[in-house]
Amino acid sequence: MELAILMLTVGSAVVEIKCGSIYRLEEAYTIFLNGEERGTTQKVVTSLFNLSPDRDYLLQLAGEDGSIRGEISFHTKTETAVLNVRDFGEQDDTVFIQAAIMACPPEGRVVIPPGKYRVTSLFLKSNSNLELEEGAVLIYDGRPGRLPILPGLLSGKEENSFALGSWEGEAADMYAALFTGCGAENVNLYGKGEILGGASMEDWWSEENRQSSPHRPRMLFLTHCKHIRVQGLHFSMCPSWCIHPCFCSDLGIYDVEIINPEDSPNTDGINPESCEDVEIAGCHFSLGDDCIAIKSGKGRRAQENPVPG
C-alpha cells in the first residue's frame, strides 16, 4: 500500500492512502504514529491532528489482522509562536480573534480553543497558521448591518482596476465572508472545529436576499491569494457558496465537510473561480446545489482577466 502526504502544518498532516478506492476504504486501518496507536481510519484521505511542531514522525497503518500494510515518514513544520485567542480579550469575539491573527509573527500559530464564538468577518494574514481545535465553534453573526462590504471594483485608474467583491463571475459588491483572504499567502486554516453560517429561509435564503446587493457572503472567500491550505473543518448552514477562491493559485482543500439543507439555494460547496493549481481531496458534501463548480468568470471581468478556470 502506497501512502502520500498531501499537506503538512506545524500540528497536522493529511495522508492519502493509494489503494484504488475513491473516498472510503474497503476495510478499517489502525493508525500508529511513532509506535503509538492514534485511532482508526476508513477514509482514503485522512487527517492527523495534535502533532508537535518540528518533529519526525513515522506513520504506519495496520490492517485488521494486525500486519503493517503501509508506512511513511514526515517532519512537521517549525513554528515561531503560539497565540491563544482567549489571551486577547473577552468581550468581542471578532475583535480578539482578529487581534490574535494580526499579532501573529511569521510562521506562528493562532489557536482557537474549545468554546462557542460569535463572529462577523475575520481577515486572514500571510505566513500564519490558524487552528480551530476540536470543540471550537465559530457562529457567524451575519446581520447585514454588522458586516463589512467588499466593493466589486476598487477606485483607481481604469487600466489598473482591482476587482475585490464577486458574484456569479462578475465584479460586484458583496458582504465579507466569515473568513476573508485578500492577497494573502502561505496560510494554513485547519482543525476539527465547526463553522456555522446560521442561514435560514427567513434571512439569507429568502427570495429577496438572494437577488439583493450587496450579495450574500461566503464562509471562506479568497481573492488573489497563493499557497493556501484548508483541512478538516466542518461547515454548515452557509448563506451562499461555502468556499469561494477567486484568482488564486496553489490551493489545497482536504478532508473538509460541508453540510447544507437540500432545499437551500445556491449553497455550493467549493467554487474555484479563475484559479490555478487547485487540489480538492477527501471532502464530504451534502448540499442544496453543486458540490464543486469550476468557474472562469464572465463578461468584462473575463475579458480583462483571462485566467483559465
Q: Can you annotate each of these PLM segments?
A:
Residues M1-G309:
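Extracellular/periplasmic carbohydrate-active domains that bind, remodel
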